[in-house]
């Protein structure tokens, strides 16, 4: 009997690499990079990364980013996040079970140029091409990115 938890983990593992880059084909194609005005804004923007690290009990950001590069990642790069995952027996004690289902909630933070409907389609195609046609994708909500004026 297949283990649904492992199946889901293997599928999720294809979505993002160890450098935090989303690996879905064509995911980055429509992104409009920050212009010079936006980059100038990042340079001047006050962001206390050390306080964020301390508040979260960690000693560095992903890829050891800091300064303008960190602010650019926070504001102008999309993300893929696993918000929650559930499978099998998680009660007290132990049981030898092979999970028949696995469920996770993932979310994508999109940036200027990206379209929520297109990203869902790209995710489905990505999973299908890698043999994960059995993984169901349910869209609960989706919003296109909002771009605020830096002035």
What are these model-predicted stretches?
Residues 1-151:
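Metal-dependent amide/peptide-bond hydrolase catalytic core
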